[in-house]
Amino acid sequence: MNSIEFPLVDRTTQNSVISTTSNDLSNWSRLSSLWPLLYGTSCCFIEFASLIGSRFDFDRYGLVPRSSPRQADLILTAGTVTMKMAPSLVRLYEQMPEPKYVIAMGACTITGGMFSTDSYSTVRGVDKLIPVDVYLPGCPPKPEAVIDAITKLRKKVSREIYEDRILYQQENRCFTTNHKFHVGHSTLTGNYDQGLLYQS
């Protein structure tokens, strides 16, 4: 046998030998065991709960919900993320082992939703805190859309090269800042300004 060339496979062992790369083998094993950490804060998470039932059966994708971030490799964020909860979400993400993935589920998670215009305590998009792999719009998204997002994430995982992902994560790290709110003195006295009532 020539050590420089690949060994020839005869007809008897041809059906029992699989040739692959270590990267493809790693991607295949991760496809079969995406373990999500569920981070739900409002109504989108209730819609996600229907996936656990027999109708949608998300166990067929190898999804086993975990309660510890150290055992999870996927975090599903659903619902409004407030400034008070933002450090907890970042801490959960940082405790997850590499490679880790994020699915942002629902309008409130992606853009802040209806709370983004007049609420000072809402994070206007979870991608300002952690890197997001798949965006899932809707208010709330249907379970079929969640299955589609998981399928798209599985396609992304199957095509990625591990070394490229590590370099990408080192270049595009998300850093958070401490938000400081300045409380001003109230100008409200409890009385109506009669001049404002009769202006035309």
Curated annotation (Swiss-Prot):
Q: Which organism is it from?
A: Buxus microphylla (Littleleaf boxwood)
Topological relation to the membrane, as annotated: Peripheral membrane protein
- The name of this protein is NAD(P)H-quinone oxidoreductase subunit K, chloroplastic
* Cell location: Plastid, Chloroplast thylakoid membrane
Catalytic reaction(s) noted: a plastoquinone + NADH + (n+1) H(+)(in) = a plastoquinol + NAD(+) + n H(+)(out); a plastoquinone + NADPH + (n+1) H(+)(in) = a plastoquinol + NADP(+) + n H(+)(out)
Q: Name one GO cellular component term.
A: chloroplast thylakoid membrane
Q: What does the entry comment about cofactor binding? A: Binds 1 [4Fe-4S] cluster.
Example GO BP:
electron transport coupled proton transport
Concerning PROSITE patterns, the annotation shows:
COMPLEX1_20K
Instruction: Name the Enzyme Commission number(s) assigned to this protein.
Output: 7.1.1.-
Keywords from UniProt, A to Z, are: 4Fe-4S, Chloroplast, Iron, Iron-sulfur, Membrane, Metal-binding, NAD, NADP, Plastid, Plastoquinone, Quinone, Thylakoid, Translocase, Transport
**What family is reported?**
Belongs to the complex I 20 kDa subunit family.
Show the InterPro entries listed in the entry: NADH_UbQ_OxRdtase-like_20kDa, NADH_UQ_OxRdtase_20Kd_su
